[in-house]
From Swiss-Prot:
Residue intervals of the PTS EIIA type-1 domain: 551-655
GO MF terms held by the record: D-glucose transmembrane transporter activity; kinase activity; protein-N(PI)-phosphohistidine-sugar phosphotransferase activity; protein-phosphocysteine-sugar phosphotransferase activity
Active site: 447 (phosphocysteine intermediate), 603 (tele-phosphohistidine intermediate)
Stated name of the protein: PTS system glucose-specific EIICBA component
């Protein structure tokens, strides 16, 4: 139960990163636009007072502000996409659900535009709809609901007369219904929840602010190895605290308030839950990297210099710290605990110095300049002396403990592992193999710094191999693996997903189970599209176009072109003279190659891999030659209909160079064994 919960929390944390990733672009526009309009920068650069420059600056500020003003909707869309595996249909469903929920709540509570003008009312105008203000939490709730609707109904089958609405088209319809129903309990209970949040944040921030900022920095840092820090900081950044802007609107959340105060040029009061990162990320951790380099064995210093130099520069410029932190987290957990304490003390120190700094992405030099130095609204220069003190503390504490306790930090290992050289195109294949192959992957995801994989069997994961491939660390919690590859993690995940989906086939062909049950048959380079190949019906039943198959791997022709048959009898016969190329271990899929070189995959039913061979009887074996009409497989049609998603059977030409299929009987209607199904050219 605990492991499953951790996996779910990981996915939620990663999903929150998608909308958060938009904020740096918005912050860049807003910060530069605001700085150009400010007197401080105009004093040094008088030419920017030009009317044209000022108009552009105003447009930049407005363009950046609109993102922050619509964060709840952006979170709804982003969370839906993140939790639905990146499918855009979930985002459409989230948008539909978001506007329906807000419109229904507004009408149910009889909210008028006049009510919205009262900041204390708890109402707001969202996309022009007077409604209850649910903030970012409301967006997250809708996003999660949209993802649930997608995962539940994306492959639903409906009667033929409602076939147009089957599959993904059904998701927004279902979301419209569920969000309408959700609006009523939200309208009744959310005001109480919001009052509770306000009371909690007021007590936390006003009564015990020093303790609160220390604990925030300390706990957030401790959660980073588990990837759960995004969940922890979200309410502090987007909900806790309140401030009234010049227009009379109530703004919630430390980051939202900070950005709004920067935009208006107001006196800064926000930033308490962000500013402590700057001394640590710009000074402390780079100094720790220097200590790790100095304590490395002489023969390893050249390699360590490259690793630590890159990680330190990444931390300094962007505030991305995981590549550096994971280099000592597992071998020296005491150092990481001290690092977390120092992080909390950094928040407390800047709070006591009355410094107010914020960021849109992380506490690196780029955000420091854009949102600290250029606006010049706080004592930003105090970060430098605090940071220098932190650099000294980090360097000597790390160096002393590494030597005293003989920690095996990078460059101090008893025996250096042999790094594996893998090109950019080979790396995703190598990582996939190190994870135990695609049959071992239950769920694949990534965030900015880490590859997140839920595996079926942890014993099949080659942890040292992942480190040799460039992972600075590998975290294991139950069957959830996190490999720290830094900023390239998301690209590795994307390419691994393509390989698993059969979109990239460069290595020897595998026939393994994955999330989409993708089965890839290696393409025979000798096959040529100049030949004509006749394929006869291997089943008796009703012909259906691939586009109507409720599985996007087949319907979007990721594996190749073809057709599907909804069987009326439980037999599969050879569609041509040829040879059995492969048989899937669970007997639900079979690959053949014809005497003329055409390669064909017959996939009996959808999601039938989960039946583990139950209901299937084989009559052939791999490598066996067959004649057209020979019996290949018997299957229990009733059992499949009762235990699988569908009995519909895709018949796929797996050669990408063969796309011209002539369907002699058409793509609809009944067909029998031996009838000509199509001609491939």
């Amino acid at each position: 139960m605990r492991k499953k919960l951790f996996g779910q929390l990981q996915r939620i944390g990663k999903a929150l990163m998608l909308p958060v990733a938009i904020l740096p672009a918005a912050g860049l526009l807003l910060a530069i636009g605001t700085a150009i309009q400010g007197e401080a920068l105009q004093h040094y650069l008088p030419f920017i007072q030009n009317g044209g420059v000022q108009n552009v600056a105003k447009l930049m500020t407005a363009a950046g502000s609109i993102i922050f003003e619509n964060l709840p909707m952006i979170f709804a869309l982003g969370v839906a996409i993140g939790l639905a595996g990146g499918d855009g249909v979930a985002a459409i469903a989230a948008f539909v659900g978001y506007i329906i929920m807000n419109k229904t709540m507004g009408d149910f509570l009889q909210v008028t535009p006049k009510n919205v003008t009262d900041p204390a009312s708890g109402y707001a105008s969202i996309l022009g709809i007077p409604t209850l203000q649910t903030g970012v939490f409301g967006g997250i709730i809708i996003g999660a609901l949209a993802a649930w609707c997608y995962n539940k109904f994306y492959n639903i089958n409906l009667p033929s007369y409602l076939g147009f609405f089957a599959g993904k088209r059904f998701v927004p319809i279902m979301m419209a219904t569920t969000s309408f129903i959700l609006a009523f309990p939200m309208a009744l209970i959310w005001p109480t929840i919001q009052s509770g949040l306000n009371a909690f944040s007021t007590g936390l921030l006003d009564s015990n602010t020093g303790v609160a900022v220390f604990l925030f920095g300390f706990i957030k840092r401790l959660l980073i190895p588990f990837g759960l820090h995004h969940i922890f900081h979200a309410p502090f950044w987007f909900e806790f605290g309140s401030w009234k802007n010049a227009a009379g609107e109530i703004i919630h959340g430390d980051q939202r308030i900070f950005i709004e105060q920067i935009r208006e040029g107001a006196h800064l009061t926000a930033g308490k839950f962000m500013q402590g990162e700057f001394p640590v990320m710009m000074f402390g951790l780079p100094a720790a990297a220097l200590a790790i380099y100095h304590t490395a064995k002489p023969e390893n210093k050249k390699v360590v210099a490259g690793l630590m130099g890159s990680a330190a520069l990444t931390s300094f410029l962007t505030g991305i710290t995981e590549p550096l932190e994971f280099s000592f987290l597992f071998v020296a957990p005491l150092l990481f605990f001290i690092h977390a304490v120092l992080d909390g003390l950094s928040f407390l120190t800047l709070y006591l110095l009355d410094v107010h700094l914020g960021y849109t992405f992380s506490g690196g030099f780029i955000d420091y300049v854009l949102l600290g130095v250029l606006p010049n609204k706080t004592q930003w220069w105090l970060v430098i002396p605090v940071g220098l003190v932190y650099a000294v503390i980090y360097y000597f504490v790390f160096r002393f403990l590494i030597v005293k306790l003989k920690y095996k930090t990078p460059g101090r290992e008893d025996k250096q592992s042999q790094a594996v050289t893998a090109s950019a195109t080979e790396l995703p294949y190598a990582v996939l193999e190190a994870m135990g192959g695609k049959a071992n992957i239950k769920h694949l995801d990534a965030c900015i710094t880490r590859l997140r994989v839920e595996v079926n069997d942890k014993s099949k994961v080659d942890v040292p191999g992942l480190k040799d491939l460039g992972a600075s660390g590998v975290l294991e919690v139950g069957n959830n693996m996190q490999a720290i590859f830094g900023p390239k993690s998301d690209q590795i995940k994307h390419e691994m997903q393509q390989i698993m989906n059969g979109q990239v086939v460069e290595n020897p062909t595998t026939m393994e189970d994955d999330k989409d049950e993708t089965v890839v048959v290696a393409e025979d380079k000798s096959a040529t599209s100049e030949l004509s190949h006749i394929v006869h019906a291997p089943l008796t039943g009703e012909v259906t176009p691939l586009s109507e198959v409720p599985d996007q791997v087949f319907s979007e022709k990721m594996m190749g072109d073809g057709i599907a048959i909804k069987p009326s009898q439980g037999e599969v016969r050879a569609p041509f003279n040829g040879k059995i190329q492969m048989i899937f271990p669970t007997k639900h899929a079979i690959g053949l190659v014809s005497d003329s070189g055409l390669e064909l995959l017959i996939h009996i039913g959808l999601d039938t891999v989960k039946l583990n061979g139950e209901g299937f009887t084989l009559h052939v074996e791999e490598g066996q030659e067959v004649k057209q009409g020979d019996l290949l497989i018997n299957f229990d049609l009733d059992y499949i209909r009762n235990h699988a998603k569908s009995d519909i059977t895709p018949i796929i030409v797996t050669q990408g160079n063969i796309t011209n299929l002539d369907f002699k009987q058409g793509e609809h209607g009944n067909i029998s064994f031996g009838d000509q199904l199509f001609e491939a050219k």
